[in-house]
Amino acid sequence: MVQCRPPQEFSFGPRALKDALISCDLALKQLYTSAFSPSERLFLSEAYNPHRTLFSTLLIHSAFDWLLSRPEAPEDFETFHASLQLRKQSLARKHIYLQPIDLSEGLAGCPLLDHLRSCAEAFFLGLRVKCLPSVASASINCCSRPARDTDGLQLHTDGILSFLKNNKPGDALCVLGLTLADLYPHDAWTFTFGRFLPGHEVGVCSFARFSGEFLQAGSSIPDSALLEAAAGGPETLPQEGGQTLCYSALGMVQCCKVTCHELCHLLGLGSCRWLRCLLQGVLSLDEALRRPLDLCPICLRKLHHLLGFRLLERYKRLHTWTRVMLEMWSGQEAGEPSVSEDTLPFSADSGMGCESDTEPVTSPSEPVTPDAWSHTFPDGPEPVSEEGLSSLAASEVLLKLGGPVDALEEYRQWLDACIQALEREVAEEELVQVDAAVDALGRWEMFTGQLPVTKQYMPCVKDNVGLRRVLGDKFSSLRRRLSSRRLAKASSSQCHWGAEN
């Protein structure tokens, strides 16, 4: 794989980022001013402030990154707002349902579900997240096949999506199936992290690829008080011979990322191409690990428009969830090396997998990409393409994952900085200064979808008569030689023809 060393920045420029957040439409500008306080607007202005400190510019790490492999028009707030008029989804329904598949009610399932539920309720503040009773995959009419790159069977997503659609609760805003089984959406694809059914607000995601190095051996159960405070302990998977495997904190965070990513798409948010964001697509496990656990300001405004929470309250809830998670895992993984943006583990499928992120017009979610090893694509768009973390050419993860507690601690410190920024008193003059500085900048040139105009060559002012005469004589001589050869060849052919007759 071609790596960019160091990673290259990708940005649309401050002016475009400001328009994506606030919009050029007068009504949407007024909506922005009325919906947020001055401190919230200054916080959100980090999206387009060239001196931002809380949010980061997108980085391209390889030539196979999702951003380069899936070029599409980014979804700004104005586009998102217009798409809501086409959706039949009713936000009067305040329940998100998680449907476990082959997750038992014992230690193998409940702690994981409790972690995901508590994270989702903090992330989607104002919505209630409920867990449905677990169902067996054998009771679902879905196809299966042997996995191509791992041991075990893979489940076809279409059968699961049909089951979720037919069994969707009446008060459900959306339903997301969760499974530890590997999934595949199409025979030509190796696997997918997630998929959804447009127009029905049902989806399914798999945590199968967050196993192996994401698991740590363990025989003890965390303190019961912490389990109660955090709504569950580390996920445990019973193994043959009585051995127990537990998700590391990093593995649990990845499961939370996938779940919240999928739920955002089910609520109507499209993929993000503006800043580093949870709603970025991924084409490899490396990209999934680098993706942050929260939204950029542009996507945060979209979610705020749907749910109407206060930004400060949401970040405080996420901070509480992160603190409890840290208390549960601190000490268990203290001896592991740390993982940072620059020292991420390298996987064999890096840059060769595929998350889906080509959104249909009627849905903000992305279709999954075919097997990147063969680079074969199915004919026509997939009618049920869901968002995506689809990684199609993934093989075994050949990395040593470490420092998951450090990753959670870094997220907690970032939440601290967000809370401090939102608690600060801000005057309108400070906002005016930031906006004026950005408005004074020129717009960056971007591809408009039109090919460049053919360059017109101006005639030379000075015409060299001597050179033109020499070239003319040369070409005339060449023409005479070619003509004489053609005549000689034609006469020779006639002689041969007469001799044969």
Curated annotation (Swiss-Prot):
- Residues recorded as binding Zn(2+) 2, renumbered to this chain, are 272, 277, 296, 299
Residues of the active site are 262
Cofactor needs: Zn(2+)
Cofactor remark from the record: Binds 2 Zn(2+) ions per subunit. One is catalytic, whereas the other seems to have a structural role.
* Keywords, in A-Z order: Hydrolase, Metal-binding, Metalloprotease, Protease, Zinc
Report the record's Gene Ontology biological process terms: proteolysis
Which molecular function terms from Gene Ontology are attached?
metal ion binding; metallopeptidase activity
Enzyme Commission number:
3.4.-.-
Q: Where is this region: Disordered?
A: 349-370
Q: Which PROSITE patterns does this UniProt record tie to the protein?
A: ZINC_PROTEASE (PS00142)
Q: Does the keyword Zinc-finger apply?
A: no
Residues annotated as binding Zn(2+) 1 = 261, 265
Gene3D superfamilies named in the record: Collagenase (Catalytic Domain)
This protein is called Archaemetzincin-1
The family line of this record is:
Belongs to the peptidase M54 family.
| Statement: the UniProt record of this protein carries the keyword Oxidoreductase | no
Briefly, what is this protein's role? Probable zinc metalloprotease.
Task: Extract the InterPro entries matched here.
Answer: Archaemetzincin (IPR052009), MetalloPept_cat_dom_sf (IPR024079), Pept_M54_archaemetzincn (IPR012962)
